[in-house]
Amino acid sequence: APWTYVPTGFWYNADLVGEGKKYSLPTTWEEFFALGDKAKKDGIALFTYPTAGYFDTSMYQMLAQAGGMEFYNKAVNYDPSTWTSKEGKEVVDTIAKLASKDYTWSDTVANANADGGFKKNQQAVIDGKALFMPNGNWVIGEMAASTPKDFHWAMMAQQKFSADQKTYVYTYTEQIWIPKDAANIDLAKQFIKFMYSDKVVELMLANKSVNKETKEETPAPIISPVKGASDKLEAGPVKDSYTLTSASGTEAVAGVWATTKPINGFDMKATVYGAIDSLNTGELTAAQYQKQLEEAWTKLLENLDR
């Protein structure tokens, strides 16, 4: 059962991007890359990412955005045509273009593979070196110590492939599990029920993060998947990110890759996400990446834990 959820998207500086700001907010990938070309002339990169693993939520969203929920559900269950389809190729080509040196901040890959370097990539958005990055609202508390008081975060839904599409927002969820052989299953069920109570909703909303060095506390609300919970948030970027999921013409996406049996020598994270670093460095082409994903899906389908 889900006990918390976080909408994800592209985070940015609301004082730099948006209505009436230096850069307009793009809604399609075509507009997004055009913005990148404009920002590049100003010495600003379009994009950065904390680590390649942060492409998980981006890829889930892109699959739904490209082909709708039926295509998405087939893809996360390793449908063999996922990456040879028009929609799958569109996702691969977009990721390859986004991760290229033309649009991704020059220090991204080096930082992403250094201890603690993910924060340097996140800082690049704060410092105006890059416009957007994939993330969730936890980034606000994570970067609180190095964020200027007058900086304003915002999150946008990832871009659409065409203007007439509905907008998809991927929602990251965390789950509570009861082992099937648990000694106190009935008690565990009561605890899960308690997790949806008003008391827990309020406790989660009041959560704070503490800076290890300064001991300074920063609000870090955790949102329960209870109707109306996000409405209790204070006005600001966190509440705005939840409002996105219920906006007209928007559909929330959840779920993860289907579970498989252990596959000897196969690293899902490195194959699907780690390879994106290689798209940036030129060690891997979009066509090679597509082939790699196609072969991975064949292997994963064969080992699907049915």
Residue ranges of model-derived segments:
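Glycine-centered hinge/linker elements that transmit conformational signals in sensory
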Residues: G36-K38, D79-N113
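C-terminal capping/gating helix-and-loop segments adjacent to ligand/active sites or protein-protein/ligand interfaces
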Residues: G236-K299
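Short amphipathic alpha-helical coupling segments at ligand-binding clamshell hinges
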Residues: E87-T94, E174, A183-M195, L203, ...
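Extracytoplasmic/periplasmic substrate-recognition and gating elements
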Residues: A145-E216
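Short, solvent-exposed loop/beta-turn-alpha elements that line the ligand-binding surface or hinge
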Residues: S24, G67-V91, K97, A145-P148, ...
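Short helix-initiation/N-cap motifs at beta->coil->alpha
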Residues: T27-F33, T108-I126
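Periplasmic solute-binding protein
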Residues: A1-S24, F33, I44, P50-N77, ...
